[in-house]
A protein has these predicted regions:
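An N-terminal, well-structured beta->alpha segment
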Residues: 5-103, 192-229, 240
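Gly/Ser/Thr-enriched, mixed-charge loops and adjacent short helices
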Residues: 33-38, 42, 151-285, 291
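Conserved phosphate/anionic-ligand binding catalytic regions in large, soluble enzymes, centered on
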Residues: 38-58, 143-144, 232, 236-248, ...
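Short glycine-rich or small-residue beta-strand-to-loop segments that form or flank ligand, phosphate
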Residues: 85-91, 231-234, 410, 549
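N-terminal small/polar loop signature for handling phosphorylated ligands or for N-terminal nucleophile
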Residues: 87-150, 255-310
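Short Gly/Thr/Asp-enriched flexible loops that form oxyanion-binding sites at enzyme active sites
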Residues: 99-107, 150-157, 307-327, 363
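Glycine-rich phosphate-binding loop plus the immediately following alpha-helix
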Residues: 156-186, 327-351, 355-366, 420, ...
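Phosphate-binding and adjacent anionic-ligand microenvironments
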Residues: 292, 296-298, 320-322, 340-536, ...
Length: 573
């Protein structure tokens, strides 16, 4: 059907409710808007659904959510694991509770029990819940740190990680096979509860989750000793982190935790924020104001679904607060865990740290220093979760920590996704340890630069919206793949990795080897002296990202090098 035919189908079919029809009637004469809403189905990709909330096939609404859930249900039934049930969580966004309820009732209508949280919860707690309940799958209704007009739907599998190949592709096939909305099943909540197929969960899972987090503390005595001396400012950015973060810090004994009042409670409009992303310095405006007022040691922000953590720490020499990238905060926690586990004799046999190919190269000297195996996986925390499962199945290694550059990490194996609640807890322990030794987190970071090298990373993003955007992004990748640059400025490309074609080319000798990772549309350029550049189209947005990293002789030298590399990459493009 053409997009106008699709519009008329939605307007005239009794399946769609009047509220949906009224929304469409209001835009029916705006052809560009009609086209954008109906020119395609909202794509159920490897990460699930993500899109603008509204009526239409290319929007997040009860009908697209129901259809996605029917596809998931069909796949679960084909595998014969429907008796295990599915756990469901949701964030603070508009329509998140409604979409979660819609998914639960669709599952119930297919004979699959839904365990749905009573109110909003962090994404990592969903990962923990489905493992604890022994579910076959999990759903989180969230659009993470996207603007308020968005929502999304992520699917997790029985190990607690987001679905990976081949399961992700098989679920996509099932969703795409549904051509008629009328074939999608649903039932009332009342009937689902009577049938024992709709169960609300909450406190019991919360308590178990908290107990599991506390197992990651290495020096509880240090926290007790410094609990009255350290000042923490925290903002949940109007999302799910408020209650769990406050609870864990309170139960550990931290006495001075100041929560940003304007961003404390859930707000689907994110009124005080341009963009609820802890990677964005503007997200810290209110928190930094409070930090200066309270003379805080550390300033923390979790994103709306509490899987990413942003950090500022005080530089006592200047009195200013320094922003930490995800690489920096991840390295602080990694160094602390590896150093203290080694010192206390609690490092497991065959320890491994798992990271992604676009994360800082500082992971290499740190893991070498402590005799820990470094394993690199494709971008996306689900691949770190997949490694934990592999370790458990084979006994090859013991997981000690995992991190990615995009402000996500995981200490422990209680969840299989990045967990900002455990990250807050770990970082506050590190801050307490530093305070005991008359240091700040920034002092510790500087000492790590002096020990391992001045590593610095950045990103350059090209956004291409609309129908032509995907084509233009494909053309850029095609050009780089077929004619890889010999150099970026004065940095020669030493090795070129094409993950889609599973080949690594030594640019000098021409020798070819394999990447050793699953196929993915990613290009990686190895440059001299720990410099690198990686090109990767986003899986959820009309963007192509260029990740870059360098190693300098000082903080200033590293900054200058990364700025020059960014300009050289732009020149090649």
């Amino acid at each position: 059907m053409s997009y106008m035919d699709e519009l008329n189908f939605w307007l005239n079919d009794d399946y769609f409710d009047q509220k949906t029809k009224d929304e469409l009637l209001a835009i029916r004469n705006n052809e560009a808007e009609v086209e954008d809403r109906f020119y395609k189905e909202l794509e159920f990709g490897t990460g699930g659904l993500r899109g603008v909330i509204g009526a239409g096939t290319n929007r997040m609404n009860v009908y697209t959510v129901r259809k996605a859930t029917q596809g998931l249900a069909n796949y679960i039934i084909k595998r014969g694991t429907q008796s295990k049930g599915v756990a469901i969580a949701f964030d603070s966004r508009r329509m998140s509770p409604e979409f979660s309820d819609e998914a639960a009732r669709c599952l119930a209508a297919n004979g699959i029990k839904a365990y749905i949280f009573e109110s909003l919860r962090p994404t990592p707690e969903l990962s923990f819940a489905l493992r604890t309940l022994g579910c076959t799958a999990g759903i989180v209704v969230t659009a993470s740190h996207k603007p308020p007009e968005y929502n999304g739907y992520k699917v997790y599998w029985e190990d607690g990680a987001q679905v990976t190949a081949p399961i992700d592709k098989d679920i996509i096939t099932e969703v795409q096979a549904i051509k008629d909305y009328h074939t999608v099943k649903t039932m009332s909540r009342e009937d689902a509860e009577k049938a024992g197929l709709y169960q609300v969960i909450g406190k019991e899972i919360d308590d178990k989750y908290m107990a599991e987090l506390k197992k990651q503390i290495i020096h509880p005595d240090v926290i007790q000793e410094m609990a009255d001396d350290i000042k923490i400012v925290y903002t949940p950015l109007c999302g799910t982190g408020n209650k769990p973060v406050r609870r864990i810090l309170s139960e550990l004994g931290f006495k001075h935790v100041y929560v940003v009042p304007e961003q404390e409670n859930p707000d689907p409009n994110f009124t005080t924020l341009d963009y609820p992303n802890p990677e964005d310095p503007k997200a810290f405006t209110y928190a930094l104001r409070l930090a200066k007022e309270k003379d805080a040691d550390i300033v923390l922000a979790t994103d709306p679904d509490a899987d990413r953590l942003g950090v500022y720490a005080k530089d006592t020499k200047t009195g200013e607060y320094v922003a930490f990238t995800g690489n920096m905060s991840g390295m602080l926690i990694a160094e602390y865990i590896l150093r203290e586990k080694t010192a206390t004799g609690t490092m497991p046999e065959n320890p491994a740290l798992v990271t992604t190919i676009v994360t800082t190269n500082m992971t290499k000297p740190i893991t070498e220093a402590y005799g820990v195996k470094l394993i690199e996986v494709l971008t996306g925390f689900k691949f770190i979760g997949e490694q934990i499962k592999f370790f458990e199945q084979t006994g090859s290694n013991n997981y000690v920590f995992g991190l990615e550059e995009s402000y996500g990490c995981l200490a422990g194996t209680h969840a299989r996704d990045k967990d900002a609640v455990v990250a807050v807890m770990c970082l506050c322990e590190v801050a307490a340890y530093c305070k005991k030794h008359n240091m700040t987190l920034w002092d510790m970071m500087v000492s790590m630069y002096e020990k391992y090298g001045y590593f610095k990373e950045t990103q350059y993003t090209i956004t291409m919206k609309g129908i032509d955007g995907a084509r233009q992004i494909a053309e850029i990748m095609d050009k780089l793949r077929k004619n890889p640059p010999k150099a970026f400025g004065d940095l020669k490309v030493e090795k070129f990795r094409d993950y889609l074609n599973d080949v690594v080319i030594d640019m000098e000798s021409g020798e070819k080897t394999t990447t050793g990772l699953p196929k993915s549309n990613v290009l990686y350029f190895e440059l001299p002296d720990n410099a690198w550049c990686c090109a990767r189209p986003s899986g959820t947005e009309p963007k192509i990202k260029f990740y870059m990293g360098v190693k300098g002789n000082s903080i200033e030298d590293a900054q200058a090098k990364v700025e020059k590399l960014t300009e050289d990459v732009k020149a090649v493009l």
